[in-house]
Amino acid sequence: MLATRLSRPLSRLPGKTLSACDRENGARRPLLLGSTSFIPIGRRTYASAAEPVGSKAVLVTGCDSGFGFSLAKHLHSKGFLVFAGCLMKDKGHDGVKELDSLNSDRLRTVQLNVCSSEEVEKVVEIVRSSLKDPEKGMWGLVNNAGISTFGEVEFTSLETYKQVAEVNLWGTVRMTKSFLPLIRRAKGRVVNISSMLGRMANPARSPYCITKFGVEAFSDCLRYEMYPLGVKVSVVEPGNFIAATSLYSPESIQAIAKKMWEELPEVVRKDYGKKYFDEKIAKMETYCSSGSTDTSPVIDAVTHALTATTPYTRYHPMDYYWWLRMQIMTHLPGAISDMIYIR
């Protein structure tokens, strides 16, 4: 009964995007319906002075498409020297070609697989050798590269869990550790792209949730350690932007589902049945097609984290529905929040 009362009002909330933020000291602000946290991001002015951009160097991972692609172009337009890490640069990906077509000495695409220590170290050397004064370091690192998958625990192979973690979690750790010496010299910024699913769990998304919860914890630990050294660490937690990031298409969802079903142990297929399996896939298709196609709230959040004198600890670019749902999941007792999923 309570789950129904909660879910129906949530579904009627307008689809406007928010950017509710915790301040740098990590203190929670009251989350009231009348607070400024409910101002849509398109109308909200971040209350913080801006650092001069100059020609500060920033590295963004995962720039082949999605957030990273848009970020690279936007930060370049703001005057940054941008190193755009692209997984598919060596394969001539269309996104890489478009970035290269800008023909700017302030935007350089680099081959970068965040799972490869060798490629990461090569990029460290490329960045260091490109800086006017390496001793002054590099201003910003945006850990954006990520992959996603879906499937209930019994439907998901252990190998899939490892693959998602290698990119989303260990890729973030690997990149951060490799670039921290340059970031520390500049007293710069680390911005980690997490997700609302790094704050609240979701059925059929455990591989992704695990990694994003890990990114949240890693970011908090790093922020505590770096604060005395003048480095500021922020986390951006986007809502549902799947439709804007090309993570899934109807075809890719069906291909993943087909492979998943075929590889399931016979006992799992027998116990759950194809009807149950297909219903879960249909829910995933609906979720993927219902998200926002406008990435600007995320781009604005990352830009603020890189340029503000006092950047926020966390940014929440998401619509009202997901913002309120996250507050319920993270602030109310588990016995209540569980009712959203357990009926």
From Swiss-Prot:
Gene3D superfamilies: NAD(P)-binding Rossmann-like Domain. It comes from the Eukaryota. The modification N6-succinyllysine is found at residue 259. Its EC number is 1.1.1.30. It is found in: Mitochondrion inner membrane; Mitochondrion matrix. The keyword S-adenosyl-L-methionine does not apply. Its main location: mitochondrion. It catalyses: (R)-3-hydroxybutanoate + NAD(+) = acetoacetate + NADH + H(+). GO terms for cellular component: intracellular membrane-bounded organelle; matrix side of mitochondrial inner membrane; mitochondrial matrix; mitochondrion. The modification N6-acetyllysine is found at residues 73, 97, 132, 177, 212, 258-259, 280. InterPro entries: NAD(P)-bd_dom_sf, Sc_DH/Rdtase_CS, SDR_fam. One of its GO terms (molecular function) is 3-hydroxybutyrate dehydrogenase activity. The active site is at residue 208. Keywords: Acetylation, Allosteric enzyme, Glycoprotein, Lipid metabolism, Membrane, Mitochondrion, Mitochondrion inner membrane, NAD, Oxidoreductase, Phosphoprotein, Transit peptide. Substrate binds at residue 195. Glycans are attached at residue 219. GO terms for biological process: steroid metabolic process. Requires phosphatidylcholine as an allosteric activator for enzymatic activity. NAD(+) binds at residues 59-83. Residues 1-46 form a transit peptide. The modification Phosphoserine is found at residue 246. Homotetramer. Belongs to the short-chain dehydrogenases/reductases (SDR) family. This is D-beta-hydroxybutyrate dehydrogenase, mitochondrial.
